[in-house]
């Protein structure tokens, strides 16, 4: 770690503590050259897998796109912002736990559907109607029947 005072390349760690609810490490350092002390914060970087679209294209995971999809499905539903954030984090965790560099968009869609099913059935059907490209009322009916069978 370069010293912010003299730009020397070497410093020693005097103290380390967890910060930001355990998501960061706060380190107190001392420059070996000039003796000045400074603080650094270290945090981990979460790398999400790339998404393989149904057309075969490969693109980076887009948290904003996932958030928009959830918000659209949950629009005007009795769900708090905290619940939405929890579901969003849970979905991303499930995707990371797959341990793959590339994940099919279909797999992500299935994870989202499972999460919405547990959270709000109306949002689940809304998402399913777009995700599975419902073409008529009968498709809605079949989805609702499947949902009711899962509950019993």
Curated annotation (Swiss-Prot):
Q: Which UniProt keywords apply?
A: ATP-binding, DNA-binding, Metal-binding, Nucleotide-binding, Repressor, Transcription, Transcription regulation, Zinc, Zinc-finger
Does the keyword DNA-binding belong to this entry?
Answer: yes
Biological process (GO), any one: negative regulation of DNA-templated transcription
Domain ATP-cone residues, every copy: 49-139
Q: Which PROSITE patterns match?
A: ATP_CONE
Q: Which cofactor does it need?
A: Zn(2+)
**Binding note for cofactor:** Binds 1 zinc ion.
This molecule's function is given as: Negatively regulates transcription of bacterial ribonucleotide reductase nrd genes and operons by binding to NrdR-boxes.
> Record's family?
Belongs to the NrdR family.
Under which name does UniProt file this protein? Transcriptional repressor NrdR
Gene from which the chain derives:
nrdR
């Amino acid at each position: 770690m370069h010293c912010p005072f003299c730009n020397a390349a070497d410093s020693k760690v005097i103290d380390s503590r967890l910060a930001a609810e355990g998501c960061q490490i706060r380190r107190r350092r001392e420059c070996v050259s000039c003796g000045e002390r400074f603080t650094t914060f270290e945090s981990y970087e979460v790398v999400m897998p790339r998404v393989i679209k149904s057309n075969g294209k490969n693109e980076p995971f887009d948290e904003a796109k996932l958030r928009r999809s959830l918000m659209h499905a949950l629009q005007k539903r009795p769900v708090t912002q905290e619940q939405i954030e929890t579901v969003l984090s849970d979905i991303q965790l499930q995707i990371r736990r797959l341990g793959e560099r590339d994940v099919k968009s279909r797999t992500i869609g299935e994870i989202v559907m499972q999460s919405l099913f547990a959270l709000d059935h109306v949002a689940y059907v809304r998402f399913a109607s777009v995700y599975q490209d419902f073409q008529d009322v009968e498709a809605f009916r079949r989805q609702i029947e499947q949902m009711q069978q899962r509950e019993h």
